[in-house]
A protein has these predicted regions:
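Acidic, contiguous internal or C-terminal segments within carbohydrate-active enzymes
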Residues: 48-51, 55-61, 161-217
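Conserved small/polar residues in nucleotide/adenosyl-binding loops
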Residues: 267-269
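Beta-strand-rich N-terminal accessory domains
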Residues: 36-85, 104-106, 110-125
Length: 269
């Protein structure tokens, strides 16, 4: 894991000088040069956001992913609270989607096929012997070099054009992701937009692994979580979603009021 962790998704900021200084070392200890490489004629890089509240977020256009989130606690001590790696090579070697944007469709699609408007679309399976497709296929959005459309003090705008037929999905699809850091508050917003020229399915997601203590030897059971969601999508014994939307009330997934993760045995479901 090379000295990378995870943080509460609450505050980032971008240091403009990071876009120009190849020798930069971030507050989290990352070196920009370790994220600069060429892949099939496209270039990867590291972008650093930071604000006056002491937060720093590092983002790479490889997979439009978060590499680190450094956030201060109530005593001003800063910790990196997301899992990750220290070089672009390590991200390319692993298959766990650390910090990445997942698409076109997060999760599994049963038997790697779906029917839309009466037309069956056969996808390219990548989920072992199951014959399903997982997280949009291989390669997915997490493996792509995203175009950097904007990089200023508090914003990074990235885009990717997924061509018609990529992994079997219909339609040319342009996805734009904007990471925005609050200037006066430790809050990070992720905004996705997508346009397509044909009917298709889309289920984008962000895939960071968090431990907001900053200590990855500790369990997350005692950490508090709040999720403003009334329903969830259950999955079957094949780990494919059933298509239902069920209420979270009375389940371990009910975080409408903040409570510790271990309180309802969420980690065991």
């Amino acid at each position: 894991m090379s000295g990378k962790h995870g943080i509460v998704c609450m505050g980032l900021l971008m240091l403009l000088s990071s876009c120009h200084d190849d020798k930069q070392v971030t507050a989290s200890g990352l070196q920009r040069k370790d994220f600069q490489t060429e892949v099939n004629g496209q270039y990867t890089d590291l972008f650093t956001l930071s604000n006056k509240k002491g937060m720093e977020v590092c983002i790479t256009n490889y997979g439009a992913r978060v590499v680190s989130i450094l956030v201060p606690d109530k005593n001003g001590k800063r910790e990196d609270v997301v899992c990750g790696f220290s070089t672009i090579g390590e991200y390319m070697e692993q298959r766990q989607n650390f910090g990445s944007t997942v698409g076109r469709y997060i999760g599994r699609i049963l038997n790697a096929r779906f029917t839309l408007d009466g037309v069956e679309h056969k996808l390219v399976p990548n989920n072992g012997k199951s014959g399903h497709i997982s997280h949009g296929g291989n390669p997915g959005f997490a493996d792509r070099i995203w175009k950097v459309e904007q990089a200023d003090t508090y914003t990074v705008r990235l885009s990717y054009l997924s061509p018609d037929g990529e992994n079997g999905f219909p339609g040319n699809l342009k996805v734009t992701l904007v990471y925005s850091l609050g200037e006066d508050e430790n809050a990070l917003d992720l905004t996705y937009e997508a346009t397509t020229d044909a009917p298709t399915v889309l289920n984008l997601s962000h895939h960071s692994f968090f431990n907001i203590s900053g200590d990855f030897t500790k369990s997350v059971e005692d950490q508090q979580l709040w999720v403003d969601a009334d329903r969830f999508t259950p999955y079957d014994d094949k780990k494919c979603v059933t298509g239902e939307y069920l209420p979270v009330a009375g389940t371990p997934l009910d975080f409408r009021m903040p409570h510790t993760i271990g309180e309802l045995s969420l980690i065991h479901i």
